Amino acid sequence: MTTSRLPFSLTKTKNFYEELNNWIGDVFYDILPEKGFDLRDEQVFMAFQLERAFKEKKVMFAEAGVGTGKTLVYLLFAISYARYVGKPAIIACADETLIEQLVKKEGDISKLAEHLDLKIDTRLSKSHEQYLCLKKLEKTMQRSDDDKWLDLYESLPSFVHESQAMQRFYPYGDRKQYANLSNEEWSDVSYDSFQDCLTCDMRHRCGLTLSRDYYRKSTDLIICSHDFYMEHVWTEESRKREGQLPLLPDHSAVVFDEGHLLEFAAQKALTYRVKQSTLELFLERLLQNDIREEFAELIEDALLANDEFFYVLSEESKEVAGSHRLEIKNDHRVKKAADELCRLLDKIGEALVFESEMYTIDQYELSVVEEYVEQMAYSLSLYQKDAISWLEKKEAESTFVVMPRTVAEVLGEKVFSKKIPYIFSSATLSEGGSFDYIADSLGIHDYLSLTVDSPYDYDEQMSINLYAKTDMDAEQKTAETIETIKRYKGRTLVLFPSFEELNEFKELSAAWELPYPIFFEGDEEISSLVEKFQEEEETVLCSVHLWEGLDIPGDALKNVTIWSLPFPPHDPVFTAKRNGAKKDPFEEVDLPYMLLRVRQGIGRLIRSNQDSGSIHIYAGGENERIIDEVKKVLPVEPHMM
């Protein structure tokens, strides 16, 4: 216990939780209102309910409406509890954009530090893909003569290029530091799961490695994404077996911000990705050693089976509109090829045990190959048990992806069985007032819950136009959207269900000569676009991923346009969910997903008692039943257009 760092004093007559309760009351009733913050009954109610979850070390679903100030509440508890226990608390956000929202200059952590005179040790633990890969940068520089790559290389810290004594190493390579690169450009130089980091000669000068070392030493908060936290959970044991540290250090508590999105993050983290060239790389490395002829022939057979599997997979896959995932059609033929490859990989796994006793292969290299072969064999066996699967293609490279259908059992065992506080925070956690659906999907059997409404007067602050009478095409919607942008002099967030629709608007809007800059997700690092949008008021932001969490109070945002109803794509992941529905796939999968996204999208507009503006929802072409369902989740009566 590090009581000297607690933001309040402990006495002999009262325990930590009693003193914490008193301090939280002082903060919300006296200290923050004196600094200009609103006194919100909903926020105070949530705070005193949350104390029970920390005291009893339980799971809590904290459903709090927009504007409750839930982030301030869970931050105060997380910081205090981390200092009391002596281990950092984890704040897991839905994605990297929301991490940046939390730690920006005018974000909630900065507000608490300033107004409560606290020094908060906050460190970011971003997903691997958010970091530069030195090896990929070298390859990109070799095949492209664009000056931007040379400029990037020369901007790297001196210790990357030089080997000398007494050098000071520090974290670098974060995506945010290269905001000018588009998403496509970034993918050419960023980490991907097929990089062989364990044997990389630049490993100890790598920005990802140095960043990990840095955030592990946090004493208060480590902020990561849901994906990264789940990757930590699934890889913790295997990393220990390989002699590596887990991705995250031992921690005191976990807060899942936008917690309704955790199930998909868990599925994503449990996903196995198999690239055609990776097995070739590992097995051909073995062939360079002095191995038995019988083993060499087995490797050759496996390489042929690998080529055959990916050939069949490519032949039997088709593209899906609105998704980068290719659907596998003739499952039987692919499974037959997978069965043969899996059989040979199992044989290689057995042979590797024998080879390890011959000492003809470097033991570390052997363990790396063994781990990969085992993982690939498991992926193929998972596929044969009807897991969710698809194919991805980039340039000439194919990647086979396998994802489990459910994660409830493994989550219940590996995560929620631990006796620490787990807080789920979101405006949309329950269905019809019940938290059973989300609890069951995550393997949670014992939990606390609370629900508080939004403190905002939506009838006074918001108007909604629902375009449902006529089915507009993209050109008509573009013209209407441009008119609303002009009316509000920019200050508009346009939300799209997919990049295809965003790019269509991007192309059509280029013909209009608007005096207001339009920022499109994908053109730059997204948190830098959000920053520009907030600082330069007369601008427009178009996004696919900002339905949740975006917090822009004030005059920078006066208008939110929902381009079309955000139904899930018809890709393998949601097709599997539909196939698993008990009665009606549309009622159980598509409709709830769409309504949740609409509620979240609307929540971007009003972020303070002083905010006002309008929502425009394009739902033309949908039947009356769907329109009625949309109207039920709207906070005010819409104007039907």
From Swiss-Prot:
Positions with a binding annotation for [4Fe-4S] cluster: 133, 197, 200, 206
GO biological processes: nucleobase-containing compound metabolic process
Enumerate the catalysed reactions: Couples ATP hydrolysis with the unwinding of duplex DNA at the replication fork by translocating in the 5'-3' direction. This creates two antiparallel DNA single strands (ssDNA). The leading ssDNA polymer is the template for DNA polymerase III holoenzyme which synthesizes a continuous strand; ATP + H2O = ADP + phosphate + H(+)
How is the cofactor bound, as the UniProt entry phrases it?
Binds 1 [4Fe-4S] cluster.
UniProt key word RNA-binding:
no
Motif DEGH box located where?
A: 257-260
Q: Which Pfam families match?
A: Helicase_C_2 (PF13307)
- Location of the Helicase ATP-binding domain: 29-303
Q: Which UniProt keywords apply?
A: ATP-binding, DNA-binding, Helicase, Hydrolase, Iron, Iron-sulfur, Isomerase, Metal-binding, Nucleotide-binding
**Organism superkingdom:** Bacteria
Disulfide bonds, paired cysteine numbers:
none
Q: Which PROSITE patterns match?
A: HELICASE_ATP_BIND_2
Q: Which residues bind ATP?
A: 64-71
A single Gene Ontology MF term assigned here is: DNA helicase activity
Q: What is its EC number?
A: 5.6.2.3
Question: Mind telling me which Gene3D superfamilies this protein's record contains?
Answer: P-loop containing nucleotide triphosphate hydrolases (3.40.50.300)
Query: What are the required cofactors?
Result: [4Fe-4S] cluster
The record's function comment reads:
Might be a 5'-3' DNA helicase.
Write out the similarity annotation. Answer: Belongs to the helicase family. DinG subfamily.
Q: What is this protein called?
A: Probable ATP-dependent helicase YpvA
- Organism, by scientific name, is Bacillus subtilis (strain 168)
